[in-house]
Amino acid sequence: MNLLISFLLTIQTSVTMLFTLPALPYTAEALAPTMSQETLNFHHGKHHLAYVNNLNNLVKGTRYETMDLEAIVRESDGAIFNNAAQVWNHTFFFEQFKTTGCEAKGNVRTAIEKKWGSFDAFKTEFNNAGATLFGSGWVWLVKDANGNLEIVKESNAGNPLT
């Protein structure tokens, strides 16, 4: 019995992870006028898909082949990191949109207002962070180790996991 369990565990841990492009949780035109269907299709169907395909090709035959996406982002560097982090970033990005529009509420809203004084002041600072980010990259609202909210700018594929 122990031999069978050991064999099954070996098979399970040697299965190759194949990353796929997540389906959008809304239609491509649902975010207009905030984001046009053309822009959404370009970023999801071209950029995001390219990162997924690149990552699958890059991890073949490496120690990353059986890892989940977050582990790859945390442990890799170079081209594998860049593509894995962009898959994670884009997936997170597309999951945040709501077709009905909304503002933060509850504990998040309270923490934002405590830190920035008002939700509008937060939006101004967040938008300014994006507008002043040189080149490509991401702007994140994060909670630091002490529980404080911060706006963080990351170049290229950088993200809060790293």
Question: Which residues make up each language-model segment?
Answer:
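Sec-dependent signal peptide recognition
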Residues: M1-T10
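Feature for soluble, non-membrane regions of globular proteins
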Residues: V15-T162
